[in-house]
Swiss-Prot record:
This is Flagellar P-ring protein 1. Residues 1-19 form the signal peptide. Assembles around the rod to form the L-ring and probably protects the motor/basal body from shearing forces during rotation. It is found in: Periplasm; Bacterial flagellum basal body. GO terms for biological process: bacterial-type flagellum-dependent cell motility. InterPro entries: Flag_FlgI. It comes from Cereibacter sphaeroides (strain ATCC 17023 / DSM 158 / JCM 6121 / CCUG 31486 / LMG 2827 / NBRC 12203 / NCIMB 8253 / ATH 2.4.1.) (Rhodobacter sphaeroides). Keywords: Bacterial flagellum, Periplasm, Signal. Belongs to the FlgI family. GO terms for molecular function: structural molecule activity. The keyword Signal applies. Its main location: periplasm. The gene is flgI1. The basal body constitutes a major portion of the flagellar organelle and consists of four rings (L,P,S, and M) mounted on a central rod. It holds the Pfam family FlgI.
Length: 371
């Protein structure tokens, strides 16, 4: 009897099959990264910079003047310098003095940033405030080489580089993590069934009425007010496992490449499909004939032979392949759908046409998304 009770308790506490952690399904409202951007100059390039770009020359003059030197714009040659935009993402809770990676991209005519050094660049947020300062040596994965005869060789993208840990935080971004008596979890993909499952899983772990689903995306969770307890609570909360609802039946079609992605929950109602293809071939040929000669006198003396005449000869041929027909039974599944279409040798473009026709006929029990 004791063994049976222990087994029942273990089964009750075991996570559901195919369960996902809340940290993989949701994000905490207000806890997010913030984009930063700045304009700067990269120096130390081996002749692959912007050249005589006025933008780069003005930037260099402004930078040098801030260092206490005076120089005319015309005296500056920017072959070894490049104007760049610097971008970064400021993660939540990053403190003053900590570092982050930055991405550097050219805005002028620079051929490559390889071997360059980014000079001190302020990084601003959307509010115009400076949150970080970036500086350091660039790591460039691409390669660009150009010869004097105009020939060139480019591998990957040499005009974009990174400065690992090249940005230093100068100002923190406040988050509402500790400002209220509750937390709000937002699903990465809104779904009412999944929102209800998340609330049920949290209440099963922490007790009744701790979580309530506000809508198909947000779940409100009561949390301790003490910061230390709230962090511990969050570490437990994000590891709660729930069984999300099956995704919406959806078929995604890329009409340009012929790529089709069909969800596992897609089904088709009874339908008969006939699909044939029409091929039109146009061939061009040239026919050459001798033009009329110039004849003089009663003796029909040929004074000048005729010029050759080129006449285009076009042939149009229409070939219609036999129509391919197949029938879908009620509630046919994904595998049966794919097998039936592949069995008749349908190409990706044929598959796109068949799916669109099934949707128009009301036989496709799924959302068709064309990208």
């Amino acid at each position: 009897m004791r063994r049976a009770l222990l087994l029942a308790a273990l089964l009750a506490c075991a996570p559901p099959a195919f369960a996902d952690r809340l940290k993989d399904l949701t994000t905490v409202a207000g806890v997010r990264s913030n984009p930063l951007v700045g304009y700067g100059v990269v120096v130390g390039l081996s002749g692959t910079g912007d050249g005589n770009s006025q933008l780069t020359q003005q930037s260099m003059q402004s930078l040098i003047s801030r260092l206490g030197l005076s120089v005319e714009t015309g005296d500056l040659k920017a072959k070894n310098a490049a104007a760049v935009m610097v971008t970064a993402d400021l993660p939540p809770f990053l403190k003053i003095g900590q570092t982050l990676d930055v991405t550097v991209s050219t805005v002028g005519q620079a051929k490559s940033l390889k071997g360059g050094t980014l000079l001190m660049t302020p990084l601003m947020g959307a509010d115009g405030e400076v949150y970080a300062i970036a500086q350091g040596n660039l790591v460039v994965g691409g390669l660009g080489v150009e010869g004097k005869d105009g020939s060139s060789l480019t591998v990957n993208i040499p005009t974009v580089g990174r400065v690992p840990r090249g940005g230093m935080v100068e100002k923190m971004v406040e988050t509402p993590f500790l400002e209220t008596d509750h937390l709000v979890l937002n699903l990465n993909r809104g779904d009412f069934s999944t929102a209800a499952a998340v609330a049920e899983g949290v209440n099963r772990t922490f007790g009744p009425d701790v979580a309530v689903a506000l809508d198909g995306t947000s779940i409100r969770v009561r949390a301790p007010a003490d910061p230390a307890r709230r962090v511990s609570f969050m570490s437990l909360l994000e590891n709660v496992e729930v069984d999300p609802a099956p995704p919406v039946a959806r078929v995604v079609v890329n009409a340009r490449t012929g790529t089709v992605v069909i969800g596992g929950t897609v089904k088709v109602t009874p339908a008969a499909v006939t699909h044939g293809s029409l091929t039109v071939r146009v061939t061009e040929d040239q026919r050459v004939s001798q033009g009329a000669s110039v004849v003089v006198g009663n003796n029909a003396t040929v004074v000048a032979p005729g010029e050759p005449v080129v006449t285009p000869d076009s042939q149009v041929q229409v070939v219609e392949e036999p129509a391919k027909a197949f029938v879908f039974d009620p509630g046919v599944s994904l595998s049966s759908l794919v097998d039936a279409i592949n069995a008749v040798g349908a190409s990706p473009s044929d598959l796109v046409a068949i799916l669109e026709a099934l949707r128009e006929a009301g036989a496709l029990r799924a959302e068709l998304v064309v990208i």
